Amino acid sequence: MSTRSVSSSSYRRMFGGPGTSNRQSSNRSYVTTSTRTYSLGSLRPSTSRSLYSSSPGGAYVTRSSAVRLRSSMPGVRLLQDSVDFSLADAINTEFKNTRTNEKVELQELNDRFANYIDKVRFLEQQNKILLAELEQLKGQGKSRLGDLYEEEMRELRRQVDQLTNDKARVEVERDNLAEDIMRLREKLQEEMLQREEAESTLQSFRQDVDNASLARLDLERKVESLQEEIAFLKKLHDEEIQELQAQIQEQHVQIDVDVSKPDLTAALRDVRQQYESVAAKNLQEAEEWYKSKFADLSEAANRNNDALRQAKQESNEYRRQVQSLTCEVDALKGTNESLERQMREMEENFALEAANYQDTIGRLQDEIQNMKEEMARHLREYQDLLNVKMALDIEIATYRKLLEGEESRISLPLPNFSSLNLRETNLESLPLVDTHSKRTLLIKTVETRDGQVINETSQHHDDLE
């Protein structure tokens, strides 16, 4: 409901609309004066009555009525000095009743006014209490919630920064370990290639050793065959020598003196020497060749043995390095897995803490929103109380004007009913006056905003009945 409608409705409720009766209007009082004239020609009293009504705007409502009475006795005329005091008694009784009703209405108005004053005081006290609570809530909410929110935000930022630094440090360590692992893997690949090359070289050396062993065996067989051939030739030579010696002994007796015969012994000796020299030379050459071959093969075998021993040593060294690198790789894998597990746990903890912080932030924001809504509700209640207070102030001012008007009306002198102006009047000659009721309606509209009056208008309406 707007301020204008509240003010208008309260004003209409207090003063009544165009259709309200005189009994329901508690803010209207009447003073009735009556004048009656008589004529001696006929008994037709003419009554003129004026009613003055005080309204909130200071206007007066006037009612005039004329009553025409016709009698069945047209020839009777009253004297001027004969007075009927029953009319005065009726007027006094009506005035007393009016005054009694006015007193009752004034008492009711005073009671309502006292109730309104008590209500206004109570509402003002409630307004002060609500204002104090509002100020207290503003101060406490701003100080407590703001400080708590800022402190928690600083703590959250600090933890987020710490977790970010820890995460960056772990990522750097992980990158370093990954680089070390890559370097060790490259080194392992190189060592494995060198090992394969050494094994291939060793295999070739083994092939050479096998070939040398086969060549040595072949040479040994050749030496044995040559020795057997030399023994056979020597045996054959000895047999030939023995045969020749036997032939020489058999033909020794047949000597021709006349003919000079060659020296067979010298020839045989020469042949033997020649064969011996050839055999010795062949034997020497065979021994030299065998010795040279054996020396070459021995030297090659020694070289191959040295190379094999060196290859074995290198292979053992490579094997030890491979084992150590494998152990180191396994250790690094374990360390990497543990670091990755720790990193996952830290990420999960970080996500959980971030979710908790988000929940805390959301809860604090909800509390802040609830506090804002509560403050807005208190402000609306305060605005409603201000509107009610303004309406009550307007009603109090209206009652004050009514009371002042009533006091000013009561202070007027009362009419003297004993000195009535009676004169003789012919009622037949008087025109018939229609009964009319004139009423002035004052509509006062007050617009307020934030407890301040921004517009005030008044309208007067004159109605006739």
Curated annotation (Swiss-Prot):
GO biological process terms, semicolon-separated: cellular response to lipopolysaccharide; cellular response to muramyl dipeptide; intermediate filament organization; intermediate filament polymerization; positive regulation of epithelial cell migration
Region described as Linker 12: 245-267
Chain positions covered by the region annotation Linker 1: 131-152
Gene encoding the protein: VIM
Gene Ontology MF annotations: structural constituent of cytoskeleton
Modified residues (N6-acetyllysine): K119, K128, K138, K167, K187, K222, K234, K293, K372, K444
Head: annotated span: 2-94
Name this polypeptide is given: Vimentin
Post-translational changes noted in the entry: Phosphorylation by PKN1 inhibits the formation of filaments. Filament disassembly during mitosis is promoted by phosphorylation at Ser-54 as well as by nestin. One of the most prominent phosphoproteins in various cells of mesenchymal origin. Phosphorylation is enhanced during cell division, at which time vimentin filaments are significantly reorganized. Phosphorylated at Ser-55 by CDK5 during neutrophil secretion in the cytoplasm. Phosphorylated by STK33. Phosphorylated on tyrosine residues by SRMS. S-nitrosylation is induced by interferon-gamma and oxidatively-modified low-densitity lipoprotein (LDL(ox)) possibly implicating the iNOS-S100A8/9 transnitrosylase complex.
Modified residues (Phosphotyrosine): Y52, Y60, Y116
Sites bearing N6-succinyllysine, chain numbering: K119, K128, K187, K293, K444
Compartments it resides in: Cytoplasm; Cytoplasm, Cytoskeleton; Nucleus matrix; Cell membrane
Region (Disordered): 1-57
Function text: Vimentins are class-III intermediate filaments found in various non-epithelial cells, especially mesenchymal cells. Vimentin is attached to the nucleus, endoplasmic reticulum, and mitochondria, either laterally or terminally. Plays a role in cell directional movement, orientation, cell sheet organization and Golgi complex polarization at the cell migration front. Protects SCRIB from proteasomal degradation and facilitates its localization to intermediate filaments in a cell contact-mediated manner.
Region (Coil 1B): 153-244
Subunit architecture: Homomer assembled from elementary dimers. Identified in complexes that contain VIM, EZR, AHNAK, BFSP1, BFSP2, ANK2, PLEC, PRX and spectrin. Interacts with BCAS3. Interacts with LGSN. Interacts with SYNM. Interacts (via rod region) with PLEC (via CH 1 domain). Interacts with STK33. Interacts with LARP6. Interacts with RAB8B. Interacts with TOR1A; the interaction associates TOR1A with the cytoskeleton. Interacts with TOR1AIP1. Interacts with TOR1AIP1. Interacts with DIAPH1. Interacts with EPPK1; interaction is dependent of higher-order structure of intermediate filament.
One Gene Ontology CC term in the entry: cytoplasm
Record PTM Phosphothreonine, positions in chain: T20, T425, T435, T445, T457
